[in-house]
Amino acid sequence: YRYTEGVHELISPEVYNSKNFKPKIAVIDFGVKQNILRHLVNLNAEVNVFPENTSIEDINNFKPDGIFLSNGPGDPSATEIKCRKLLSALFQLKIPVFGICIGHQLIGLSFGAKTNKMSQGHRGANHHVKNIFKNKVEITSQNHGYQIDLDSLPNCLEVTHTSLFDNSIEGIRH
C-alpha cells in the first residue's frame, strides 16, 4: 500500500530535498511503526509498504530506488528462514538496502552472520552508540532483544556502530 501521511510539522524541508528528487522507497513490513513511515514521507520519499510475504515481482513493479527493512518483533532467525527467498532476491537488485531493528539483523543473517538473544535487551531512549567511522557518540532510541553475533560476522560485512553499554553491534554495512 502507498503511505503518504507525513508528521505534522517539518522544520526545514529544504535540507532534505535535493533538486526535487523523490526517491521511491519499498518498505518491507515486519511490524513497522507508522512514525517511521511518516519520517520517510517527510524526507520527500514516495513510500510503498509491502508485507513480508510479498513477491520480488511486486517490488520490481514499484521500481524502487531503495529498500527499507523495517523494525518488528520476534526472533530474527525465524523471520529470516520464512523470508529467505525474498531477502536473497532483494540483495540481487543492486540498489541500497537499509534495515533497522529486525531489518538490520536480517541483513546480517542474509550474509551468513548469526544472531542471539541478548541477556539484557536495549529498550527506550538515550542509548549511547559509537559511530566508528566518525569516531563520535550518537544518542539513539532502541527496542531490541536480539543482536548480531560479532564472532560470526562474515568478512563482507563491516561494523559501523557499537553500543557503549555492552559493545553489541548496532550498525553494519556491506
Predicted regions and their residues:
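Beta-strand-turn-beta hairpins that frame and shape the catalytic cleft
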Residues: 20-25, 134-137, 174
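A generic "binding-loop/recognition-motif" signal
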Residues: 32-33, 55, 102-103, 144, ...
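Catalytic beta-strand/loop cores that center a nucleophilic Ser/Cys/Thr
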Residues: 136-174
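RNA-binding accessory domains that recognize and position tRNA/RNA substrates
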Residues: 1-62, 74, 86
